[in-house]
Amino acid sequence: MASSSLQSLFSLFCLALFSLPLIVSSIGINYGQVANNLPPPKNVIPLLKSVGATKVKLYDADPQALRAFAGSGFELTVALGNEYLAQMSDPIKAQGWVKENVQAYLPNTKIVAIVVGNEVLTSNQSALTAALFPAMQSIHGALVDCGLNKQIFVTTAHSLAILDVSYPPSATSFRRDLLGSLTPILDFHVKTGSPILINAYPFFAYEENPKHVSLDFVLFQPNQGFTDPGSNFHYDNMLFAQVDAVYHALDAVGISYKKVPIVVSETGWPSNGDPQEVGATCDNARKYNGNLIKMMMSKKMRTPIRPECDLTIFVFALFNENMKPGPTSERNYGLFNPDGTPVYSLGIKTSSTHSSGSGSSNSTGGSSSGGGGNTGGSSSGGGIYQPVTGNPSPDYMSISSAGGKGRFVECVLFFFLLCIIKLRL
């Protein structure tokens, strides 16, 4: 009898083990609409699947987009623009917004997050800064009233300009002049379990100091990297160093913030720019985004400071947006042209393992149609990094490639736990 029970348990163990993918893509894409030539949102899903995306971040709560993603399997993040913060401080208006723009589309459209404001604390607008935290509280309160606070989190996005310095990561802290506004937000993250969102662009760091910043280091290409003298952690790419700079800043504020997760809400590289925008080329954009997406597909998204945490990243952006103000680069961050053709080849292949409901393999980038969105930006500044030197650390390389092994160990432990319980019964 005991032998039969153990055989049944072993069968369940095998089923659980092989039904859990050891490598699971968690690729996010920013989907903006600051353009007058984009196709309708219903045509966007094939493009997102072609790059292996499973998460999509909007810059508004566009009804057409929310309807288009119904039943698609994609996890959606919606947003409240800075222009709405003052009125969303009113709990009644916040509740109306949540009911109309979030609850009305559930459960068919899988909305998982609301981003309240973008780079507000570094906007140098005191009225906007004052309205941010009350708006976050009101939106969260509205989710609580609707019984949605367990499935949808509330957060806001920051630029790296919230840091006083960003090199080396172990020396970073948050700007003192922002702590009064930032600390209540960090307490909110601790209380609600929501992540802090960071817009991180290694492109800006390279553009500002190309003589002293290694291009290979910022493009995820093979390089010597550098070892942080304060932590002895080795970094072979700038994005991870920027993320760990924020983790160091969180640790410096207080022990209660050590468990606040980070999401990279924007990162990308422009394929074109003005003459003075050093590094804004199609080849560099192809390398940055292609290498980044390949890393996400292979589950190597764990930084030295938080090797136990998988880092969620949203690439900016899905389309080139022809109506964005600013330098030429601002209109050239897209993976795709408005007609759905790829701006450049990412050199990746996707299958049903890496796409949201896609049943066939695709070679990117992209063959079908395009999409829409509203506002979005790549205005965040990257930290200035010094010349990178040093040798790659074998220990760090083993940390960052430790992707799916944890699931296997968990399954084994779970199986033996079941055996012990069964034998005792």
UniProtKB/Swiss-Prot annotation:
Reactions catalysed: Hydrolysis of (1->3)-beta-D-glucosidic linkages in (1->3)-beta-D-glucans
Glycosylated position list: 124, 362
Tissue: Highly expressed in flowers and siliques.
The protein's enzyme class: hydrolase
GO terms classed as biological process: carbohydrate metabolic process; cell communication; cell wall organization; defense response
Keyword Cell division in annotation: no
Protein's name according to its UniProt entry: Glucan endo-1,3-beta-glucosidase 10
EC numbers on record: 3.2.1.39
Residue numbers spanned by region Disordered: 347-387
Bias (Low complexity): 350-366
Function: Plasmodesmal-associated membrane beta-1,3-glucanase involved in plasmodesmal callose degradation and functions in the gating of plasmodesmata.
Organism for this UniProt entry: Arabidopsis thaliana
Annotated compartments: Cell membrane; Cell junction, Plasmodesma
Comp. bias intervals (Gly residues): 367-384
Record: active site: 119 (proton donor), 266 (nucleophile)
Residues covalently joined to lipid (GPI-anchor amidated serine): 401
Any matching Pfam family: Glyco_hydro_17
GO cellular component, one term: plasma membrane
